[in-house]
Each structure stands twice: as C-alpha cells, then as structure tokens.
C-alpha cells in the first residue's frame, strides 16, 4: 500500500496550526493504539502511520522539507535529518501519553520497512499537456547498495539479532504502574546489529543516486493529475520492496487559452465595423488558425463554439470544444477625419435609437421610469 500524504493521514489541511496537528494526533492515536485494538493489524498499521505523520509535521525543519519535496525530503539517510523513526510505536507515544494503556511486549521481530514513496512535481505547457509526450525525469532517490546487496553488512558478514530488544526494535520501560514502549537504544529501532558495516553505504543498505526515468505523459492531463510509477520510489530497507514514484502534474497558464475540463476558452477582439457588418475573422486554435464567420450585428461578448477544437479527455477520449468570445474593440488614435465620420454616423441615428440600439433604448426607458416612480 502506498504511503499516504501526512496531512491526509491526520485529517488536517496544509495550513493547520501545530495545535491542530497535535489535537488530531492525540485523537487518532487513542483510537488506533494497539492496546485498545488487540490483534487488529489494520489498527496497528494506522497507529504507526499517524505517529510518523505527527513526527514530521511537528518538526519545523522536517515539515518544511516535506512540504517542498514530499516523502523524499524527510528520509533519514538524506544528509541532514529527516524522519528517523523505525516504524513501530516509538518514543513519541511515550512523550505524549506515557503509555496510559500499559500492556506487554507485542509482535515478533521487526520487519524491514518498504521504501518511501516519492513525489516529482512536473510542470507542463498547455500544448504539452494536450498532446502528450515522453519526458525524461532526473529523480534523486535511494537505491539498494550494490556492494552489500542491500544488507548493510560487509561482504562475508551478516547482521545479527539485537540482544537488547530481541529483534523487535522496541524496548519496554516500566515507570510505576505504567509501561512505556521506546525505540531500542542499541539498534535504534532496526532490530538487528551490524558489527561489520559495508564501507560504501555505512550499514544503511542504501545509497543516494539520481535516477533518470523516461516517463510517458498521456495526452489530456491537467493540473492535479497524478501518474503512478510502481516500484520507482526509494529502495526498501535491507531488501524490502521499493516505494512508488508519483508524478504530480501542473499545467502553466497560457497567454491565449483558458482550460476548463476538456473545453478551451479564448477572447478574440473584433472591430466595430466587423461586428456591425459581419465577415470572417481568424481565430487561434492549438492546431493553428481557423476562419470564423461573424454574422452582421454581432454584439460584444457573444460566444462562438468550435466543436472538436478543445482537449481530448485522458479518461474517456472524448474531445472538448473551443469557445471564442468576441469582444468589440473601441478604436483609438483616430484622425480628425475619422472622428468627423463617426459624428456624422451618430447624427444619422438620431431619432431612430429604438431601431438601431434597442437594448440601449430599453435601458434608458427603464431608468426614466425608475426616477418617475421615485417622485410619485
């Protein structure tokens, strides 16, 4: 199962305060704690997930790294910290609750953790998103160490079970009537001791590497779409399965078109004369220019639909439309002769406004009636 977003795990928004995060954590930790759900593996997994999310989102540096890079930004082996808990019921529970449930040692030996999922933010132009393409991505990640085959131990040696926690990665400390589960101080939660570590990975079993992946982006993707590449996340601990890579798509704003689902919108300026007399204009599409017939007496703001000139759906393969809104442009920088012609034209309409400008006439009739009603 893929590692979920930490904010989603705690049920809070990305702008949640630390107080809101702690409140959500306490509620969920009480709900899923294994002592309240004995033998329930799903509850146990949920508890670990909640604990991990809380550790990251209440640490300022880790939270900033996670917000920017996702799970890849908080890996313990990436040079400056990151999430370092092993994945069992670490000391965070003891810090917040003091193990109010008590209870004995649970489970068998700790299993190596699956690799973390990675997120890659990919920005595309509208043209790239509409047509689809193959992108080459360079992804910094952790891969299994080829020197020790991911074991962390020098060739010819092997890891041994930790004698302190007997392979569980956790130890139980009693404080009066209460028992507190804490990360084993000897193996640091791994459950195993590597006495002769690999010189290349220093006993981690994984090393940093930038992978180059060729990713096919399907035609029709849009902002918010996510492409999953199974097994292309970080290598798991000591031979455990790798995580997945999620390519998060963002489409840049376009200077001409606005996308809404599978439809495209654009505004096309037309002259006063073209709007009044009609004619043909050229409008842009993603496939080039096309001719659009404008009928006489077209009003500004009228929408024209060009069917099949939109975006092909990435799911249904249906093709949307291009909707062109014509906007009448008022002429500027007129010569005296041009202004004179417009005055003559305006004068020729005097007394015939109902015929030539019915909307304006109706509007002013309504205004006149409004003020008459006020005075009565």
UniProtKB/Swiss-Prot annotation:
Domain J positions: 5-70
Binding site for Zn(2+) 2: 162, 165, 184, 187
This protein's GO CC annotations: cytoplasm
Protein's UniProt keywords contain Glycoprotein: no
Location in or out of the cell: Cytoplasm
Signal peptide: none
Cofactor-binding details, from the entry: Binds 2 Zn(2+) ions per monomer.
One MF term in the entry's GO annotations: ATP binding
Renumbered zinc finger spans (CR-type): 132-210
Chief location of this protein within or outside the cell: cytoplasm
This protein's UniProt keywords: Chaperone, Cytoplasm, DNA replication, Metal-binding, Repeat, Stress response, Zinc, Zinc-finger
CXXCXGXG motif repeats: 145-152, 162-169, 184-191, 198-205
Domain comment in the entry: The J domain is necessary and sufficient to stimulate DnaK ATPase activity. Zinc center 1 plays an important role in the autonomous, DnaK-independent chaperone activity of DnaJ. Zinc center 2 is essential for interaction with DnaK and for DnaJ activity.
Function: Participates actively in the response to hyperosmotic and heat shock by preventing the aggregation of stress-denatured proteins and by disaggregating proteins, also in an autonomous, DnaK-independent fashion. Unfolded proteins bind initially to DnaJ; upon interaction with the DnaJ-bound protein, DnaK hydrolyzes its bound ATP, resulting in the formation of a stable complex. GrpE releases ADP from DnaK; ATP binding to DnaK triggers the release of the substrate protein, thus completing the reaction cycle.
Protein name: Chaperone protein DnaJ
Species annotation: Shewanella amazonensis (strain ATCC BAA-1098 / SB2B)
